[in-house]
């Protein structure tokens, strides 16, 4: 390429779009941090002994247009056929108003988990709608705000049954008509919790005492039967019963809660969320009020704010890993908020009558097919069904299956049977096509007329729903597109996202989610594919996944990858399972001690507990590094039982520890494995790598380093990379392996496959040099923020040369002792300045951890630093007595528009200082919609359902 052509090329254009500071801004920032160049700063920050010796070997960077063209070539390899496989995944129509205004809207998908409720009331309301929807359709007393998928929800339900039950048994009963992928994930979880799983006919549920049982309703092959007596008998035998159910079926069927179930789980996928070759989708869990504090997952509750007005928040957070660590009953990272919101909006848009029509249509078409099959001499495995039939096809099975394939139709193949599942997209033409395949001579409309006289004949009377559902006004109001559009916009406007400003959350990497990366997610070639279609029909996904794995291996220094885990915590779990299986394969299954530094993220000990490891905490020294003497002592004490160490690099204290290689060598010498948490991978890419450092396994947070958006609290992805000796122990899957020996951790083989294009696109457009530059700029931005704030706030930890990694910790404890102003006061006051708070009290209580990422430019960094410096000035006014501790802009923060309207203002500071504390806020103001939320009130007066419509009035 000539020099002129090269200078005009768009090949590397995306790198400059993704990274915030341009060359001129970088020069200014380098001067502030007193570094001669960007490379000089990196040399002072990253230990020389772990720096990569050569650049990563990745394909040259692509322009946005070239990337999309390449992505389209992947998509075209996927074959879209009419699919009636069912098994927990169904075609659905995503209402266009939801597709465009939620799924494709950065106002919804770039928000963070609603830890800060004052700037999250919109999605909190939508998630509360989700909980109400689940509670109504399942007839249960409390529901959570989503889990990862139906299979992992079943595994969580098993753990709940063991925690909450009174049985001393070690047995968990699983009915043999539960979805096979669910059974496999339950088996994996049980194997490392020491539970025995018995898969048997539902009629044998009381042959042995079990602490819990899992039933499917309707069954995986479609059978609808009344479970009331079966559940009662099991409960009389001290067995807590979980029922996996279908939300659309629950519109017409008697809900599992009315049959006596203790726990109800399932997937909300068919409520407007594309199949996406397996995900992401929102699972649900509902239970009895008695079990609410042992239920996993986020729970949205109704509380009040400082003015006594209704305010929503995440309730019962004391169950979570960030507080209870290895004793946690829930991992707050494990959720699918964006998909739960889509499902909730689907229910709001259709309402109970719309859902009833959809359910009746799917059932009626199924009944027509059943009648036609019976007329043609076929035998149905079950006479009672909702939308799924199992047809006894015997010797004809293969021929009929192939005939369907020739007609571009996918059926579910079972031993001597074919399965057919209908959904809201099924048409009369589909039924006629199946009539042709099965040689049915009947006429569809004639059969329809006959069935209409007894429309629900295929549903036993005892299984027909009589109770009302979705009676709250929110589900009975927004049914025109105009109403729906305005309701969703009303909620969106309440929330702070990356569309408003920087979200400087430490350990969260809230970087740009570029539009080009997001575009392929909603292409039908990726979205409309069932995860269990024949492999040849998913060749595009296979090629994309394989190429992404190779890219990730090059970036991480690992030898193999699994893309199956649906979240970072799920990836941690899969990694520890791989380690334990490796030890078992060597006859060292007794190795069960996991060393975890005291600075570790709460998911680490919580995940170790999930594989029955004994957590031993390693101290950190005064500089925030692993205490090498204490580490040596712990290794020596536990060397015969040492399984692993879980470390994060750079450490959760925001520094590159000099002795990380020595840590790995010490653990290896004692027979242990090194798990390197990938949470801070954004400070490694292109400069070092987990494999080069010496670790054996890591999960990567694709929703951090590799640009999958956080979605307001999910989806995420946590693929794991391993060295070659652990590769045989990566999670398998029932569709691609032998049932019972695959150790699956998710319902689908590629987990949340439809968001993999996001990370592939990011890597492809950045190239090796762009990725390394992003890491360097993340480090520059963090050090710039640190240097600007250092004269005003204590910086808790810095590395060997006074540098931080990609984040820094501001120590508020001395200020609190001196003035009474807390880290929470500062976090809430930042909202008045137009910012989301940094991470509060992690990894050290009484601190704020700031991670600016590479995507923020100098102006935004300065706006943030100026805000914190101004807040320090406000703290000084409290210190000097100008403002009393009990009444100042910090303790009353955040301020709302309602504060401006108050007739009486008796505070010692002006309304302007309260609401417009900076020049930026006068020009462009983001308004919190409630005052500070009362967390204690919310937990003491727990309400997790939609409140009266009157309370929604502004």
Curated annotation (Swiss-Prot):
SUPFAM superfamilies: PLP-dependent transferases. CDD domains: GDC-P. InterPro entries: GcvP (IPR003437), GDC-P_C (IPR049316), GDC-P_N (IPR049315), GDC_P (IPR020581), PyrdxlP-dep_Trfase (IPR015424), PyrdxlP-dep_Trfase_major (IPR015421), PyrdxlP-dep_Trfase_small (IPR015422). It holds the Pfam family GDC-P. It comes from the Bacteria. It is an enzyme of class 1 (oxidoreductase). GO terms for biological process: glycine decarboxylation via glycine cleavage system. The keyword Oxidoreductase applies. GO terms for molecular function: glycine binding; glycine dehydrogenase (decarboxylating) activity; pyridoxal phosphate binding. Its EC number is 1.4.4.2. Keywords: Oxidoreductase, Pyridoxal phosphate. Its cofactor is pyridoxal 5'-phosphate. The glycine cleavage system is composed of four proteins: P, T, L and H. Belongs to the GcvP family. The glycine cleavage system catalyzes the degradation of glycine. The P protein binds the alpha-amino group of glycine through its pyridoxal phosphate cofactor; CO(2) is released and the remaining methylamine moiety is then transferred to the lipoamide cofactor of the H protein. This is Glycine dehydrogenase (decarboxylating). It comes from Vibrio cholerae serotype O1 (strain ATCC 39541 / Classical Ogawa 395 / O395). The gene is gcvP.
